[in-house]
Amino acid sequence: VITKDCMNLTNCICKSVIKIDRLQNKTDCTCEKTIVPIILYSKDFTPLKAFGNVGDVEDDCFGCFETSIFKIEYICKTTCCGKLSLLRPIDEHGSIAKTICETFRLEETDFCIDVNFHCFCALQRLSMALVNRPLGGIIPK
């Protein structure tokens, strides 16, 4: 249920998500993907959290991780529902970041969640420079 006091703000979130989705799908001559990392906040301003590689089923060196940072994969303009992929937060030492503030680098993953963007009242865009940012010669653990 969308409350009256959040209705306009919710529509604002949907519009922002649509704009970011368009930006990410815009192509240019460089053939590089544009990824705009986002954090979504619930009505009590708690960041959305999701888990990737639960049960360590994917063959990667990190195992299960928690994140509040996502990439928009898809949004349905009529329902304001869509799909987010989880961005893996990495600290400056190449390990999974334990907090958002420890995040030095973001890595794309194949882990996704489906969301209703009407459930959120705030969206924070993070720097695109975080995505696949070099660790400065540090080898990930």
Predicted regions: what is each one?
Residues V1-K141:
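Short glycine-rich, low-complexity segments
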